[in-house]
Regions:
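Membrane-embedded alpha-helical segments of integral membrane proteins
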Residues: 1-7
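A structural signal for multi-pass alpha-helical bundles of membrane permease subunits
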Residues: 10-275
């Protein structure tokens, strides 16, 4: 009761400051909780396996030395090369730099995201703003395909890719995912909120249909575009099954496949694997 009575004695501005401080304290605690795994990963890459098992994060300052904290997971002092991390000679035949795998993953994730964004946004825009025969049947069919697990189509898709001759080619990864039913549904829902009056005014001013889509509609659904790009990029970046099946040349492998190979070779060298 005393605390409750004191709260009424505070000025509105003081109560607002207290509320703001409490809010920031809660957010800070949540941020620390979320960042803890990442901070542990960053600290682990600078430690040997023995030190990693002994200390959860960094060792005490009194024990900091080149033996407890070093760059051996990145740098081999004997050869003076970055072969601890950037070479995978023990997992695959030949020498392919780690940067090549990283570049392959970036290329596939970025290209697939851009292509999927273009076709999905076009499809969602058409389904939201145009009236044509069979429109709602297409929407129902599109929603139905979202309930089918992607791995269920793996065998027929593999057969199709093999007959086309796209095995060991990035086309096998880019073309099947060029349009996303989930993406078209999201953009359709976003485009429904765009007033038709803006589109009519643009048509009166002489804008083409594609210009309306590009210059009127897309800027208004920018939040949806950002969210879709983030989800699509992360999905393509973490893709493992399809690249592992279709890609056979070592220089075309992606980062998740190489990291999976590192699990076997570096199963007890957690520092190198985490790096």
């Amino acid at each position: 009761m005393v605390g409750l009575g004191l709260s009424y004695l505070l000025l509105p501005k003081q109560r607002q400051w207290i509320t703001t401080i409490q809010r920031y304290v809660v957010l800070l605690l949540v941020a620390i909780l979320i960042l803890s795994p990442f901070l542990w990963l960053v600290s682990a890459v600078f430690k040997d396996t023995d030190v990693l098992m002994q200390y959860a994060f960094l060792p005490p300052l009194s024990e900091w030395s080149s033996e407890t904290l070093n760059l051996k997971n990145f740098y081999n002092p004997e050869t003076e090369e970055l072969d601890s991390l950037f070479e995978a000679e023990k997992t695959i035949e030949g020498e392919v730099h780690f940067w090549r795998y990283l570049a392959n993953s970036l290329f596939l994730a970025s290209t697939s995201t851009i292509v999927t964004l273009f076709f999905s946004s076009l499809g969602g825009y058409a389904l939201a703003k145009y009236e044509f025969h069979g429109k709602y049947a297409i929407i129902s069919f599109m929603l139905g395909t979202m309930m089918i697990p992607g791995l269920l189509l793996l065998a027929p898709l593999y057969n199709l890719i093999y007959k086309i001759g796209w095995m060991d080619s990035y086309w096998a990864l880019l073309v099947p995912g060029a349009s996303s039913a989930f993406g078209m549904f999201l953009f359709r829902q976003a485009c429904l909120s765009v007033p038709n009056s803006l589109m009519e005014a643009a048509r009166i001013d002489g804008c083409s249909e594609f210009s309306i889509y590009l210059n009127i509609v897309m800027p208004l659904v920018r939040p949806m575009t950002g969210a879709f790009c983030l989800v699509s990029f992360l999905g393509n970046w973490n893709s493992f099954v399809y690249p592992n099946i279709y890609i056979q040349t070592q220089s075309k492998l992606t980062l998740p496949i190489i990291l999976n190979q590192f699990v076997d070779v570096y199963s007890q060298q957690y520092g190198i694997f985490l790096a």
